[in-house]
Amino acid sequence: MAGPTRGRPGPRSRRPPASSRRSGRARRRNQRSDLSARLIVAVPAIAVALALVISGGLVFTLGMIVLGAVCMHELFAMYERAHPVRLAGLLGLVGLLLAAQYGTQFHVLLAAVAVVPVLFGLTVVQRHPSAAGIAVTLMALYWIGFGLAHAVLLRRLPHGEGIVIDVLVGTFVGDTGAYLGGRMFGTRPLAPRLSPNKTVEGLGIGMLAAVLGVWFAGRYQDWLPGTHALVLGLGVALAAPVGDLFESFIKREAGTKDTGRLFGAHGGALDRLDAVLFTAVVGYYIWAAYA
């Protein structure tokens, strides 16, 4: 068989079009800049989180109250048309977290029940009372309030300082692993209606990263056996994507891309804490069973 005509490259020597090469380089540059922006946001946030966790006690609880108030403000702003009962939400948040600081999980449950008649009473005197407003306020209390209350409960357990850090490490390492894994290897959409950019491959890599992150952190804590660290890591790995997808659903229903602008292009407090609100709960019950 005759070879390719002189002057014309054969099939193996063909190069992709210049436009394709340029778009590939631009995509890689965007990925690097996006990762850099994530790190710029993450470093000061991690420093503040570590300071609160190490301080513990009432300082940690007050920090969670402030963080919860910011998260509630973002949620209520997204659902402003429902007329949420802001005062009831804030009072309930403070009650839940103080119950966690000075009581047990039973007292947290009592506070969650006690806030319901307060919510109904404040709804009646609102200018625009609505069932939708009650629903949004209750969602804020039982999503944001319960999640942060369990973070306080977790901090109060034996070795709570280290376990809270382990849960945060697993959550954020898993999130970063899912992001990078999805960018590099993702082909199959995970939940296209909720979050088009999430992939099955990213989910798997993120879960593996979360388990390994907690296990690796546990190797420097002689009071945390390897099997306990693996179980805790698995719980974090399973809970984190559920929290992420739940928040994506909330944003989709509200018709918004980000919950706020606290972290600039990387969204609001809820965008950064969506997974933590679930992993703190799971982490508490796993460690409470061991402790």
Q: Model-predicted segments: where are they?
A:
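Interfacial loop-to-transmembrane junctions
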Residues: 88, 253-276
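Membrane-embedded alpha-helical segments of transport systems
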Residues: 177, 204, 270-280
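Hydrophobic transmembrane alpha-helices of multi-pass small-molecule transporters
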Residues: 210-211, 275, 279-280, 288
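Juxtamembrane boundary at the C-terminal end of a transmembrane helix
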Residues: 285-291
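Membrane-embedded alpha-helical bundles of polytopic integral membrane proteins
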Residues: 25-234, 238
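Acidic/Ser-Thr/Pro-Gly-rich, low-complexity N-terminal segments
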Residues: 1-29
